[in-house]
A protein has these predicted regions:
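Carrier-protein-dependent adenylate-forming modules in NRPS/ANL systems
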Residues: 1-148
Length: 148
């Protein structure tokens, strides 16, 4: 029985790195891709001086970068808040006010000006560059159990 999804994803990635993890409109992304991209993001997040366990808003749709960002945030010890691009601005504003994330990972264009968001916004191009970094990441402080 799976005890922790992060550890299970990493186990599959190491045992079968080419096994399909995500099909994005016919583009197949493997568990190896998910492992490497999420590790790269987690390593970068660890260097950002974010408060421990602080949530990170991830803005996008159904792209692979969303999944990699979810896992990367969890590996770095941060909860993630997924927000779809078709969400109404008042709803997004409410989420920002309630959860108070200091960072947004914008898989799609994030309307920071319209929302008066003053935290860090990592745009799509920056995020893709981060995800493609080669890192040696040690999974030692991920979100687990009741951490959320």
């Amino acid at each position: 029985m799976v005890q922790n999804i992060i550890q299970e994803i990493d186990r599959i990635a190491q045992a079968q790195p080419d096994f399909p993890a995500f099909d994005e409109l016919g583009t197949i992304h493997s568990y190896g891709d998910l492992y490497h991209y999420s590790n790269a993001l987690a390593a970068w997040l660890d260097q950002q001086n974010l408060p421990a366990n602080s949530p990170i808003l991830i803005y996008g749709d159904h792209q692979f970068e969303m999944m990699a960002s979810f896992i990367g945030c969890l590996k770095a010890g941060h909860a993630y808040i997924p927000v779809e691009t078709d969400s109404a601005l008042p709803r997004v504003k409410s989420i920002l006010t309630t959860a108070a994330p200091q960072m947004v990972l914008a898989v799609d264009d994030f309307p920071a000006d319209e929302l008066d968001f003053t935290g860090t916004v990592v745009n799509h191009d920056q995020l893709v560059d981060l995800l493609h970094q080669e890192v040696d990441y040690q999974l030692d402080h991920f979100v687990d159990g009741d951490d959320l």
